[in-house]
């Protein structure tokens, strides 16, 4: 099938670039309406309106303050070289990725409070206070434990752009956040710090940690990718590469130092690091006719998926990069991709605002297994390692959305709970989730620990931590994951080819 390449229209500034114009026909409108009626649960149903909007950067508060600075500065300056960088570069880092901890004594659970005021052009806004009782429960909790962010980091300069990947989590417990041209690091032990990057006017568009947390890849809108060594105390840039156009996504292999880089021209660049060097080993040309928006590996590094602004999702086997194994065409751009960590061939694909669906595919046989209507742009999908569940984050919706994250059971596709948007400064329904990531940890024997938190980047310039898959309230969750299994619960059936589609579909219901 030949996909006609669409023209690109540009207006001043990258974030206002329009990559495609889509109009809904009457047939398309009816199709979306039918999906809503057929797939909405008996719970609270969402209403889908006609959408002529795009996925890229849809600002809703054009006249609001662009950079908010918290009144609280660091109480103590770090005695490291990194702490001198803001003075050298004339940067103001007060309040960036910072919070106050008002935990009560004798509290055993790790729940931080965000008791601060944010100074804006309209004055100080009301503070968000989460009190902690000695039994570890939230005393002023609105709804369940899961609905309240347990930590909020202020992130002035966080770009509201569907096509960027501003968060990365190291398996060593370090969070990297892209704020305009800079990269900030945060950990529970050392707090926030700024990386000593070369001065530039180009924004950071993507971040990615290697599976061991030893290397951090930083990409910018001008096509440069830097590989920073995080194994040494003195951060250093080991390698630097350039590509045509901006970079929206990158992904490290879970088993080695192989890095995928998605370009704006539709190419996927494959890099591999050895003990002495890192070099490009392959270029997969014209995988997509437009920008590559998402890249994702399966858990053993034998397959990866790519999603593009041309609505295409492609599957590659690592030992056969010349040819796509499968590809599927959708009705909107695809950024959200997630392989299941306990069902090797199960892939979740989240689409943009013109489709608003999550599709589930078998990447061994190429079949579509299920689909789920979400009612908004899907910006991320995350699988639990502890329970047979997944969650997804919501971006732009024509009607607005009150939810930031929604958790579902697999394969029942019934909702466990949703997390309402916790907006700062009264964003309300205009609040969007740009990206969400897990906080899993990996050990030397290739075993994983379930991350207690899901970290989300919101359009109100905050980074929030939600505790979703902890050990509390296990009765509301689905079955626990006891071992890695196939789609049918069998490794043998997982490896069989040419299983009839009807059998495949019925096998997961």
From Swiss-Prot:
It is found in: Nucleus. Keywords: Meiosis, Nucleus, Repeat, WD repeat. InterPro entries: Cdc20/Fizzy, WD40/YVTN_repeat-like_dom_sf, WD40_CDC20-Fz, WD40_repeat_dom_sf, WD40_rpt. GO terms for biological process: anaphase-promoting complex-dependent catabolic process; meiotic cell cycle; positive regulation of anaphase-promoting complex-dependent catabolic process. SUPFAM superfamilies: WD40 repeat-like (SSF50978). The keyword Ribonucleoprotein does not apply. WD repeats lie at residues 159-196, 199-238, 242-281, 287-326, 329-371, 437-477. PROSITE patterns: WD_REPEATS_2, WD_REPEATS_REGION. Its main location: nucleus. The keyword Transmembrane helix does not apply. One of its GO terms (cellular component) is nucleus. Signal peptide: none annotated. GO terms for molecular function: anaphase-promoting complex binding; ubiquitin ligase activator activity. Belongs to the WD repeat CDC20/Fizzy family. Has a role in meiosis. This is Meiotic fizzy-related protein 2. It comes from Schizosaccharomyces pombe (strain 972 / ATCC 24843) (Fission yeast).
């Amino acid at each position: 099938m030949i996909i006609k390449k669409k023209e690109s229209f540009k207006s001043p500034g990258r974030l206002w670039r329009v990559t495609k114009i889509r109009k809904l026909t009457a047939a398309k409108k009816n199709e979306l309406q039918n999906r809503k009626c057929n797939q909405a649960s008996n719970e609270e149903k969402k209403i889908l309106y006609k959408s002529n909007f795009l996925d890229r950067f849809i600002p809703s508060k054009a006249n609001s303050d662009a950079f908010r600075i918290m009144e609280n500065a660091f109480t103590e300056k770090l005695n490291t070289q990194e702490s001198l960088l803001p003075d050298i570069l004339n940067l103001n880092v007060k309040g960036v990725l910072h919070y106050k901890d008002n935990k009560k004594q004798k509290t055993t659970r790790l729940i931080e409070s965000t008791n601060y005021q944010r100074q804006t052009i309209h004055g100080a806004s009301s503070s968000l206070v989460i009190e902690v009782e000695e039994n570890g429960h939230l005393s002023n909790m609105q709804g369940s434990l899961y609905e309240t962010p347990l930590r909020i980091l202020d992130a002035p300069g966080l770009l509201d752009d569907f096509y960027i990947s501003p968060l990365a989590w190291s398996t060593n417990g370090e969070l990297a956040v892209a704020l305009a041209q800079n990269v900030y690091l945060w950990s529970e032990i050392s707090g926030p710090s700024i990386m000593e990057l070369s001065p530039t006017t180009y924004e950071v568009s993507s971040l990615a940690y290697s599976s061991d947390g030893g290397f951090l890849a930083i990409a910018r809108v001008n096509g440069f990718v830097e590989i920073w060594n995080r194994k040494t105390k003195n951060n250093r840039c080991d390698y630097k590469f350039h590509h045509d156009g901006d970079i929206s996504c990158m992904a490290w292999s879970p088993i080695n130092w192989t890095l995928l880089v998605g370009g704006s021209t539709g190419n996927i660049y494959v890099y591999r690091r050895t003990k002495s060097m890192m070099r490009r080993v392959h270029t997969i040309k014209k995988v997509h006719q437009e920008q590559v928006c998402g890249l994702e590996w399966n858990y053993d590094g034998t397959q990866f998926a790519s999603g593009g602004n041309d609505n295409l999702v492609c599957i590659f086997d690592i030992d056969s990069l010349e040819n796509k194994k499968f590809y599927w065409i959708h009705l909107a751009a695809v950024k959200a991709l997630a392989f299941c960590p306990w069902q090797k061939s199960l892939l979740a694909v989240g689409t943009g605002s013109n489709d608003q669906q999550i599709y589930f595919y078998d990447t061994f046989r190429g079949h579509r297994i299920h689909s789920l209507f979400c009612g908004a742009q899907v910006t991320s999908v995350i699988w639990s390692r502890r329970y047979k569940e997944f969650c997804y984050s919501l971006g732009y919706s024509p009607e607005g959305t009150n939810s930031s994250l929604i958790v579902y059971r697999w394969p029942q596709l019934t909702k466990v709970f949703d997390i309402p948007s916790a907006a700062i400064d009264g964003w309300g329904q205009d609040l969007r989730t740009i990206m969400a990531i897990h906080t899993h940890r990996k050990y030397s024997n290739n075993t994983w620990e379930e991350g207690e938190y899901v970290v989300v980047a919101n359009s109100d310039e905050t980074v929030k931590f939600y505790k979703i898959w902890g050990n509390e309230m296990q009765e509301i969750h689905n079955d626990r994951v006891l071992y890695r299994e196939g789609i049918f619960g069998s490794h043998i059936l997982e490896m069989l080819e040419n299983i009839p589609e009807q059998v495949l579909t019925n096998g997961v219901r």
